[in-house]
Amino acid sequence: DENLFQDYCIGALEFIFYPNFIKPKKEDRIHNGRKRIDITYLNAANDGFFYNMRTSPNIIANKIVVECKNYNHDPENPEIDQVSGRFSPTIGKFGIMMARNFENRKLFIDRCRDTLKDSRGLVIPIVDEDIINLLKMIEKQERESIDGYMYNIYSEILKD
């Protein structure tokens, strides 16, 4: 169910990325209600990966845009375009695509790279396996490793 998956995403991301992600808003309406974002958070990061995304002149991630895809197939170009279509000068150009898994992760990373190269913003994929890995870091008292994990995904997207 789409609603349950959104609730899972809100809770997981807020717990994992606290205190960087604050004030989650489900079904955030923009453009006078003509468009909807599954989840937004204010980016309150004062250091690390999300701070760098907030202060990067090409990203300016004031908000974290999250689209949730509870599919049994890989999200494709239209789903990435949906995320980047929610970016704006006030929101910024950073988003997370939450999905269950990727049959072809490399292809999805390539699509994220295309979006970034076309100056349409940065979309970071996070799947169930990533959530489990991030929660294990917290369980082992290694919360400081989360930034490195995010930088690793970002580095995959930057590779040519």
Language model features with spans:
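Catalytic core segments in nucleotide and nucleic-acid processing enzymes
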Residues: 1-160
